[in-house]
Regions:
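Generic signal for short, ordered secondary-structure residues
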Residues: 13-14, 46, 77, 81
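Extreme N-terminal tail/first-helix region
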Residues: 1-24
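Short, structured beta-strand-loop surface elements
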Residues: 3-5, 58-127
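Covalent nucleotidyltransferase core used to form phosphodiester bonds in nucleic acids
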Residues: 15-17, 52-65
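Extracellular/periplasmic catalytic domains that process cell-envelope and extracellular macromolecules
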Residues: 19, 45, 115
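Short beta-strand segments
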Residues: 22-56, 73
Length: 127
């Protein structure tokens, strides 16, 4: 099975298809001080048409601080990309649910190895 979008897919559908199979995406946020586009690879969970992100250093993560100022980002996966609206949340039960989704996808040991703080998560919604 190819990870490339099909020719007749809309850009949004192509991105959704890649998100359903991928392990890493690139996000591009706007720097809160510089105003410049900043891109970074991140892990994610795509479930029920929802894209969940978990900042590796929780609320201390720079890209997270940037989306607090401008709650949108560009998401790219293997040649498909799109703008998403970002909804950060701090509710402990919701954050814990996202952490569990990450553990299920990437393994508890890798999540423990790479993620140091679990006080925030982000829901990114396609526009």
């Amino acid at each position: 099975m190819s990870n490339k979008p099909r020719r007749n897919d809309s850009p949004k559908d192509a991105l959704k298809g890649l998100l359903s199979r991928g392990r890493e995406i690139n996000i591009t946020v706007t720097g809160r001080k510089s105003g410049r586009a900043i891109s970074i690879p991140v892990w994610f969970v795509f479930e029920d048409e929802k894209l969940y992100l978990l900042p590796v250093q929780g609320s201390d993560t720079q890209w997270y601080k940037n989306v607090l100022k401008k709650p949108s980002m560009r998401v790219a996966a293997r040649g498909a990309d799109g703008e998403v609206k970002v909804v950060p949340f701090t509710d402990a039960a919701r954050v814990s649910s996202v952490v569990e989704k990450f553990r299920a996808k990437y393994g508890a040991s890798d999540v423990k190895k790479y993620y140091s703080k679990f006080d925030v998560a982000v829901l990114a919604q396609m526009q």
